[in-house]
């Protein structure tokens, strides 16, 4: 199975756009790592930088890819690929969506 996880306020706590001070949610990182270890594919998708670049994924990538990758690696998150460029939105409607609190609540 393939899973795609958001970063801010899903895998870590982030206040506003203060990404440098994001703190990992260890229980969630551990659970994602267990999915990885069980052979699932793990993608990380974030909207970091999309608001400040007028939803320009190339500029968002240039601005935040290295910081985000360094954070994920320092948190020991196991994943297959990191994607920037998720459009900024207040609500995502998706037939395969799941609220983070619902996904993680019975596990952590």
Identify the meaning behind each predicted range.
Residues 1-108:
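Catalytic phosphate/metal-binding cores of nucleic-acid and nucleotide-processing enzymes, i.e., regions
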């Amino acid at each position: 199975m393939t899973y795609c996880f958001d970063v801010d306020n899903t895998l870590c706590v982030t206040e506003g756009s203060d990404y440098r001070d994001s703190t990992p949610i260890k229980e969630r990182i551990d659970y994602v790592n267990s999915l990885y270890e069980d052979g699932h594919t793990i993608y990380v998708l974030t909207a970091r930088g999309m608001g400040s670049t007028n939803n320009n994924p190339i500029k968002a990538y240039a601005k935040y890819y290295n910081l985000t990758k360094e954070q994920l690696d320092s948190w020991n998150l196991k994943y297959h690929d990191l994607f920037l460029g998720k459009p900024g939105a207040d609500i995502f409607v998706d037939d395969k969506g799941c609220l983070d609190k619902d996904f993680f609540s019975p596990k952590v």
